[in-house]
Swiss-Prot record:
CDD domains: SUMT. The active site is at residues 248, 270. Signal peptide: none annotated. Gene3D superfamilies: Cobalt-precorrin-4 Transmethylase, Domain 1, Methyltransferase, Cobalt-precorrin-4 Transmethylase, Domain 2, NAD(P)-binding Rossmann-like Domain, Sirohaem synthase, dimerisation domain, Siroheme synthase, domain 2. Pathway: Cofactor biosynthesis; adenosylcobalamin biosynthesis; precorrin-2 from uroporphyrinogen III: step 1/1; Cofactor biosynthesis; adenosylcobalamin biosynthesis; sirohydrochlorin from precorrin-2: step 1/1; Porphyrin-containing compound metabolism; siroheme biosynthesis; precorrin-2 from uroporphyrinogen III: step 1/1; Porphyrin-containing compound metabolism; siroheme biosynthesis; siroheme from sirohydrochlorin: step 1/1. GO terms for molecular function: NAD binding; precorrin-2 dehydrogenase activity; sirohydrochlorin ferrochelatase activity; uroporphyrin-III C-methyltransferase activity. It comes from Nitrosococcus oceani (strain ATCC 19707 / BCRC 17464 / JCM 30415 / NCIMB 11848 / C-107). Residues 1-203 are annotated as: Precorrin-2 dehydrogenase /sirohydrochlorin ferrochelatase. Then it catalyzes the NAD-dependent ring dehydrogenation of precorrin-2 to yield sirohydrochlorin. Finally, it catalyzes the ferrochelation of sirohydrochlorin to yield siroheme. The lineage of its organism: Bacteria, Pseudomonadati, Pseudomonadota, Gammaproteobacteria, Chromatiales. Transmembrane segments: none annotated. This is Siroheme synthase. HAMAP family: Siroheme_synth.
Amino acid sequence: MQYLPIFLNIRGQQCLVVGGGTVAVRKVALLRQAGAEVKVIAPKLHEQLQEWADKGKITAQQASFSETEIKSCYLVIAATDDSSLNEQVYHLATAQGVLVNVADCPRFCDFILPSIVDRSPVIVAVSSGGASPVLARLLRARLETLIPQAYGRLGQFAARYRSRIKQRITGIRARRIFWEKVLQGSIAERIFAGQEEEAEGALEAALEGGFVPEQGEVYLVGAGPGDPDLLTFRALRLMQQADVVFHDRLVSPEVLALVRREAERIYVGKKRSWHAVRQEEINMMLVRSAREGKRVLRLKGGDPFIFGRGGEEIATLAAENIPFQVVPGITAASGCASYAGIPLTHRDHAHACIFVTGQLKEGRLSLNWQALVQPQQTIVVYMGLSGLEILCQELIAHGMPAVTPAALVQQGTTSRQRVLTGTLATLPDIVQGEDIHAPTLVIIGGVVALYPQLAWFKVPDREPLDAR
């Protein structure tokens, strides 16, 4: 180990930055974040440095560096493009016993500045010892995706209770186990969900009882349209800590594969005219699993609040006093349209966009047709495959031109994506002649005409299908 990883408290300490360019701006910003009193000296100052100086946030002097500037400084950073000046700063600082760092020159550094993941008060520092700053930045980027932003709030919460827990639980091992349950369980999830009062109440009860009870919770998570790269960080974190997952048929196999391997998987999907499990029973299955102390993942394709019946599920959970949180997902309209190269709004084609469901009821579609046939508007139809012919006929009958461009997207954003395009008059026959597999999405409006120019996503071994 070439360097000892340590954290310095420089709050209120005088720190000097020699240099006035973009590198100096980055160093000054970092020192300011840590609460240092920063002085900058350079013949010419970057406009950002000058702005900070004008606002009294730093002290800046437009002058050449002199040895006297180092006196009374806690640390010095040389960030000029003059290597001989940087070396001079290094030798003068070390001679006076002042910590010094020369930017991008490890051999003239008493300390190095790592790549930082900031979740204050939790700080993660990553360093390659100056060997490869790019590698350190790449590692930091990976860590940024793994550590929730709310860890800062969790750290502050833990700090408030540290002394009390130490007094209440005197055994080191017992205290460690207690903290592990707090920081990895439902109390931490309350913090992540912004429910600090509930977290405090649960921790107070745990302190009173001397143990952290196992409390179940439901995660209602949007799985997006299919491509696992479109999952949110929060969704992925909850997927990987669930004990049981209830999923529907709209969740792609690629997304389902990212759920914690040990989690029990229960299929509760629905197909047209066939329901595996009634919605009311799904609601109560979530309740029962949570009451067993399980972390319950309810994984839904797209977004749980857009034609996903998520509102019904959390209404039941709320009525049964089951803790829950909702994680939005990229809805199929947005995801499929983007991957098909069909913008839902466009200055020249559509100033509005409307989402509707195309499910048939007793062979009919109950929609507000007058609202749908407005000009310069895009219509996105979820679950519209079975009623596509009726949909197109009704739109034409209510005044929409038969030549209006229309598209059907099959299994959008995945390697099984297909795009069929036509018009209101021709699309039903085009689709009828193809082997189409759900889930599908129908897009209607002038924006569909842009598809041939804007289609960018290429399915492996198959070009997007334009069956006009």
